[in-house]
């Protein structure tokens, strides 16, 4: 299992749009930069592409806007879109394909240091008796 933290405001991987026949992500360059940061942090932590099923734990920390008083970030960006960006950023770094991910635990909270804490490891096989 490898553990690492990626500094920076998490960027969601939103829907794709077709403009003039080209498919683009709604976040464009910000998303590409965020996924690159994820890949670099994973490599620095010693990630190697797993060949077996993997499990992932993600803890997103969002910067609380000054005017917000609620305790939980129950607004955009959607947690599933944040997860999608991380999974794509780890493809070919921590596993060959994100289809190998068979278990995900994820949460998002407010905090002073925005980013995502990532844990990736081989999923232990279940033994039947």
Segments (PLM) and residue ranges:
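Acidic, proline/glycine-enriched N-terminal capping motif
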Residues: 1-129
């Amino acid at each position: 299992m490898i553990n690492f933290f990626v500094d920076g405001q998490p960027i969601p991987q939103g829907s794709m749009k077709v403009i003039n026949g080209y498919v683009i992500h709604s976040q464009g360059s910000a998303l590409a930069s965020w996924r690159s940061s994820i890949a670099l942090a994973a490599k620095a932590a010693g990630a190697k592409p797993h060949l077996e099923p993997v499990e992932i734990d993600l803890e997103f920390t969002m910067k609380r806007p000054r005017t917000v008083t609620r305790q939980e970030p129950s607004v955009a960006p959607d947690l599933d879109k944040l997860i999608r960006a991380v999974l794509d950023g780890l493809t070919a770094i921590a596993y060959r394909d994100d289809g190998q991910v068979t278990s995900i635990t994820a949460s998002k909270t407010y905090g002073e240091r925005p980013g995502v804490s990532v844990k990736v490891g081989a999923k232990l096989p279940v033994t039947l008796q």
